[in-house]
Amino acid sequence: MTARAYLCEGMDPDEAKGALARANPGAVVQTVKAGSVKNEFLAEMVAAQTLQAMESGGLLAKKPEIDLLLRLAGTTQISRAIRLEGSVNGGRFLVIVAGHMALTSPPGFTGAQLPRRLLSRSELARVEGAALLGAERS
C-alpha cells in the first residue's frame, strides 16, 4: 500500500484529481483543504484504513474517496466532512492518492509532495479516531 499527498496551487482541484486518477488507475484519489494534512505519513495511515475497508466491505460511504474524506474529517456525516476538510476552487489544496501499486505523477503535474515524518501524538490520535469511525459502524 502506498499513498502520496501533494500540495497544489494554481490549478483546479477536480482537474488535479482527474489527472492523478488517470495516471493511477484503480487508486483512490481525493482533494482536501490545504491545511488538512501536513505529514504524508498521516495521509498514508488514514488512506490505508480506507483501502482495508474497501477490501472488507466496511466503507463509511459508497465511494472510497468519500470514505477517505470522512476519516480525515473525523466524522461520518458527509456534509460536515465537506465543510471541515473539503477543497475549494481558487486556493491551495491537497490531493491524496493511494493504492496497492506504485504511484506516479502525470506529466506536467506541479503539486509539491508533502514531507514525510513520524507521526506526532496529535496525528496518531487522528489516525486512531479515523479507525474508530469504522468500529462504530460495525
Predicted regions mapped to residue ranges:
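Glycine-rich, aromatic-bearing surface loops/beta-hairpins
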Residues: 84-138
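Ordered, amphipathic secondary-structure segments that act as subunit-interaction surfaces
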Residues: 37-97
